[in-house]
């Protein structure tokens, strides 16, 4: 860490201790790539408020920051996997997921489950390397952390919190089929009006869509497993020295910070310890680099289109690139395209290629007219924040579902990346740019996002600090966590009541038979 950052950190810590004395120590178990963007935003704010933040990373981690000047501390745990091997593994998983046919539900999610298990095996290995490292665990124990902040999509943070005997807070976007939320968090998702995540339904479902939604829910609840829970349950039981399960350990989370909000998500019930903090990474646009600003200003009244398929897509076939470039060349707007590859033959004079774009700053520019996006949650939230209509080109994971949400809210047109033609893309761009319907809906979502009593980032930081101050948030924990599945669904009560009713019916029936028998006996005696 440079002298500049060291001095800044010391000043922050000193000011904290001299003022409120409420500075805490936060241990972080993060997830890579776009997940890191969200959690790092929270960590930077915690540091600004004087807290000491330590990020626990495995040696092949490609988190932005460990080798760069930062006020964050990084505790690196050595593993046998190299950084290149880890990055290649993740890249291959992304490519496999992108190549899975999306038109058939069952085969699609069987392959998704296989890939999730592969990823889970890798995370479990990292977790085992951490908890079995006696030197590291002793250091963590002696550091006396106040809270663990973990991304629930990569298990282990809750295990560390259990071993260190400290509370933990989750950050989560979603899990396939809401598995973590339902089984680890006790969340409620009534299938009659809450579409199963990744089903691409809206909350306004037809009868047949509700039938499919129910089937999907049953499939995710009883068949699909995002993680090989038997392996995780066995691993956690061995480490803790007592029988337990992954979801039982997850259920001890004090607060769930869900990276979503009602501008994006469809309404559904929430538990008291769940906070929606979607878009916490969004911020006002900063000035563009001089050369880029000049290109944007040269667009005149037509404005510009921003095109990015995210950081996970590093290459594109020559055929697809030419199809896209051909469509972009035919619009009057200037185009800024994030593209890392050979220059397409059909590239127009109105299009500039960049290996990296200041996406948030471009979306916040007054001359931006539309955003072509893969549908990643971070990108969509930046578009919502700035009120920009979208053309969605989803590739994998939650992107199809995210784009479906934006379609339901009238803020985007979607295309299939593998089958769209140049004409399709051109028509979609003209639609979202020229039809005021899309801009109006995008601005409406932006207005909803900005009209919150507390900003998402401040809300997230508040609850982390709350857990540190109060050593947890047990008063928000619903009693459902202490019930068995049959108690939760009142099956024992229903069984008892049915038994009571059956007993009463039996007694009444028996009495009637006795009375009838008595009456018959009496009549027979009189005849004799």
Curated annotation (Swiss-Prot):
- Glycosylation: which residues? 315
Please list every transmembrane segment annotated in the UniProt record, as residue ranges.
493-513
Q: Where is the signal peptide?
A: 1-23
Q: What is the lineage of its organism?
A: Eukaryota, Metazoa, Chordata, Craniata, Vertebrata
User: What's one Pfam family here?
Assistant: UDPGT
Q: How does it sit in the membrane?
A: Single-pass membrane protein
Q: What is this protein called?
A: UDP-glucuronosyltransferase 2B30
Q: Could you tell me which cysteines form disulfide bridges?
A: none
Q: Which reaction does it catalyse?
A: glucuronate acceptor + UDP-alpha-D-glucuronate = acceptor beta-D-glucuronoside + UDP + H(+)
Any idea where this protein resides?
Microsome membrane; Endoplasmic reticulum membrane
* GO molecular function terms attached to this record: glucuronosyltransferase activity
Q: Does the keyword Hydrolase apply?
A: no
Please give the tissue specificity annotation from the record for this chain: Expressed in several tissues, including prostate, testis, mammary gland, kidney, adrenals and intestine.
Top enzyme class of this protein? transferase
């Amino acid at each position: 860490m440079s002298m500049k950052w060291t001095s800044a950190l010391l000043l922050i810590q000193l000011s904290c201790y001299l003022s409120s004395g409420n500075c805490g120590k936060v241990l972080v178990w993060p997830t890579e790539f776009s997940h890191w963007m969200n959690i790092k935003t929270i960590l930077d704010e915690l540091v600004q408020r004087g807290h000491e933040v330590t990020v626990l990373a495995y040696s092949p981690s490609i988190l932005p920051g460990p080798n760069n000047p930062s006020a964050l501390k990084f505790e690196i745990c050595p593993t046998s996997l190299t950084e290149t091997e880890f990055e290649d593994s993740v890249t291959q998983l992304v490519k496999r997921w992108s190549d899975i046919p999306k038109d058939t539900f069952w085969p699609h999610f069987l392959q998704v489950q296989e890939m999730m298990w592969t990823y889970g095996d890798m995370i479990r290995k990292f977790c085992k390397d951490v908890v079995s490292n006696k030197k590291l665990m002793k250091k963590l124990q002696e550091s006396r952390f106040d809270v663990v902040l973990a991304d629930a999509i990569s298990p282990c943070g809750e295990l560390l919190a259990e071993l260190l005997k400290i509370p933990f807070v989750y950050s989560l976007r979603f899990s396939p089929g809401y598995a973590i939320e339902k089984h680890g968090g006790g969340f409620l998702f009534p299938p009659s009006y809450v579409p199963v995540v990744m089903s691409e339904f809206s909350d306004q479902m037809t009868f047949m869509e509700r039938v499919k939604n129910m089937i999907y829910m049953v499939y995710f609840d009883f068949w699909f497993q995002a993680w090989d829970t038997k392996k995780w349950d066995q691993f956690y039981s061995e480490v803790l020295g007592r029988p337990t399960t992954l979801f039982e350990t997850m259920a001890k989370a004090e607060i769930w910070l869900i990276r979503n909000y009602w501008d994006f998500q469809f309404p559904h019930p929430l538990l008291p310890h769940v906070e929606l903090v979607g878009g916490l990474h969004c911020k006002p646009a900063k000035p563009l680099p001089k050369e880029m600003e000049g290109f944007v200003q040269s667009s005149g009244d037509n404005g510009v289109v921003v095109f990015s398929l995210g950081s996970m897509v590093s290459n594109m076939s020559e055929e697809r690139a030419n199809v896209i470039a051909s469509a972009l060349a035919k619009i009057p707007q200037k185009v800024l395209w994030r593209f890392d590859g050979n220059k397409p033959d059909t590239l127009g004079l109105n299009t500039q290629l960049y290996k990296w774009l200041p996406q948030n700053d471009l979306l916040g520019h007054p001359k931006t007219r539309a955003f072509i996006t893969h549908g990643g949650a971070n990108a969509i939230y930046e578009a919502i924040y700035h009120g920009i209509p979208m053309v969605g080109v989803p590739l994998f994971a939650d992107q199809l579902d995210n784009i479906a949400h934006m379609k339901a809210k009238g803020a985007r047109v979607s295309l299939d990346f593998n089958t769209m033609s140049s004409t399709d893309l051109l028509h979609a761009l003209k639609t979202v740019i020229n039809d005021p319907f899309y801009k109006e809906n995008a601005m409406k979502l932006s207005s909803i996002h900005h009209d919150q009593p507390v900003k998402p980032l401040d809300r997230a930081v508040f609850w982390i600090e709350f857990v540190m101050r109060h050593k947890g948030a047990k008063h928000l924990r619903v009693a459902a966590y202490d019930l068995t599945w049959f108690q939760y669904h009142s099956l024992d009560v229903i069984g008892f009541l049915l038994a009571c009713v059956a007993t009463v019916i039996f007694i009444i029936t028996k009495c009637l038979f006795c009375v009838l028998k008595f009456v018959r006996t009496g009549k027979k005696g009189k005849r004799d």
